[in-house]
Amino acid sequence: MKTKAAVAWKAGQPLTIETVDLQGPKFGEVLVEIKATGICHTDYYTLSGADPEGIFPAILGHEGAGIVVDVGPGVTTLKKGDHVIPLYTPECRQCKFCLSRKTNLCQLIRGTQGKGLMPDATSRFSLDGQPIFHYMGTSTFSNYTVAPEISLAKIREDAPFDKVCYIGCGVTTGIGAVLFTAKVEVGANVVVFGLGGIGLNVIQGAKMVGADKIIGVDLNPEREAMARKFGMTHFINPKTTENVVDAIVQLTDGGADYSFECIGNTQVMRQALECTHKGWGRSIIIGVAEAGAEISTRPFQLVTGRKWEGSAFGGARGRTDVPKIVDWYMDGKINIDDLITHTMPLEDINKGFELMKSGESIRGVVLY
């Protein structure tokens, strides 16, 4: 079949809108009509050329929502008409990682997904006979896409695509880091470094679980108002604060119980660890640093009880947890509407990237 898609031909170049060929689903695969997709910093990270796994030409996009159009042989959990959110972190429920219950990092198809291919090591996308690579197993910058069954979360049918697509990455990454990775408890003091889309979702996750002080740290004073709307209680601007770590330690009577780094800056990661409380402070790294970057601190910081941890996709098990998060949105427990600041047709997707890079948008969403 033919489908309209935004194709990334080379790193550092704008996407071009093409009509590409899409093969139907093979064994264990599902054809999905994407109805809406967010434009995420991770897409830009790959497009910029900084992603060591970036491969071109490719159809990017990993934050979508849509409807099942067809299923391949062997598919048992989905049928035509089901509403779904594609998952860049699948959940097979049978690999060593899934069965351990210690992680959400399913590895069943990781080897091929990282190469831009489907599980059988081929691509479903092509143009004039030239294969086009998949991206993160989802490729939501195409009106139609094929994904493995284990990479699709079935969701309720009354959920609006233009809002819940954001649960495919940003919302889950932020809220999940609080609920599933850190398991923040009532009354805890939390600090969030970086008040973009991920940081705001960390803040609303902290508010959701009943955290006490929720401190936001950002260089942009214009982000304070929105962060307070989502539950932030204190704001620190490093430009006007002599020592951010000392300020947080004083504000929290010895340090934060939990910190979350949502930027991908290794110097900030160090601050995020060292501002946590001696004996039990936990710092969760969410931001993705540039390839080859390393983090450092004095070992004494760890010996005295602080812990550095990472969180991918918020620690969420996609097929299990994403439907719950959709329910939270539909029940009014979390706010997504205020985070989606711009919508556009696929033809304007490059403008969406510019809005994100300039900081004008929290999340731009492409509507098909």
At which residue positions do the language-model features occur?
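N-terminal Rossmann-fold NAD(P) dinucleotide-binding loop
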Residues: G199-L200
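Helix-to-beta-strand junctions that scaffold the AdoMet/dcAdoMet cofactor pocket
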Residues: T276-K278
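Adenosine-nucleotide cofactor-binding segment
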Residues: V192-L195, K207-Q271
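Glycine-rich beta-strand-centered segment in the early N-terminal region that forms part
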Residues: Q23-T37, A50-L99, N104, T112, ...
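C-terminal hydrophobic helical "lid"/dimerization subdomain
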Residues: M1, A247-Q250, G254, R270-E274, ...
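NAD(P)H dinucleotide-binding glycine-rich loop of Rossmann-like/cofactor-binding domains
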Residues: L22, Q94-F193, I334
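Rossmann-fold dehydrogenase core element
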Residues: G281-I284, S296-D338
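Glycine-rich Rossmann-fold phosphate-binding loop(s) that bind the pyrophosphate
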Residues: L195-G196, V288
